[in-house]
Amino acid sequence: ASQPLTRSTLVRDANPFAAFMQSRQFMTALFAILFTVTALQNLGYTAYDQCFNYFIKDQFGFTSAYNGAIKGVIGFISLVANATICMSIIRRGKVNRSVAYVLMACTLTIFAVLFLDEMRVPFLIVNVVFYAFNAVSIPLLQDMVAKKAEGNDSNLVMGFYNATKSLGGIIGSLTAGFLYAKGASLSFVFAGIVLLLATLFAFVYQRKNAPSPLSARR
């Protein structure tokens, strides 16, 4: 029989930090590394995306309609990338080996943008590539977390995953606003550094999660 709802139960369930407090039930070193990657990925992406529209409007003088058209193209290409590249990686079972390289591609495109901020067409093309790779990274990371979650703790694990994404988004939005006020490109620099850290942690996770030679032979 289900337990009756009480005030304490409602307060506990509504607590946005409940997922963090419950993480001690399942947290391991590998989980900590993986969740660091997911938090950094969302932090970097949010910081970048928050300032992208303002940047192309302020620096290139694009209208709102033009900005909307650009976002539409980016959304379509991201959808195609998810339906092709992402699904191919998942079907082949190479998610752990691929996600670090996908994040590396995101990082490289962001740093490339810093050298193209005065050239409209190359700037937009590289941004489309960034958004496409970022769109691929999200379901790959979610797949990694879902496969790592086991048994009765699976709901807690996925709840913690969503909490880390939300935390990254909140910090990314706040940081992007402060940095953009200081300099138009600073949020891009910050996003690039954060995604570089996400890439490094992804490689660490890949190495630590790799099967041992003995288990691979079996």
Where do the language-model regions lie?
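Intracellular helix-loop hinge segments at the cytoplasmic ends of transmembrane helices
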Residues: Y54, P139-K148
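C-terminal transmembrane helical hairpin of 12-TM major facilitator-type secondary transporters
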Residues: N96-L141
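A late C-terminal transmembrane helix in Major Facilitator Superfamily
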Residues: G151-A181
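A membrane-interface helix-boundary motif in multi-pass transporters
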Residues: F178-L196
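Juxtamembrane intracellular "pre-TM" segments in multi-pass secondary transporters
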Residues: A1-L34
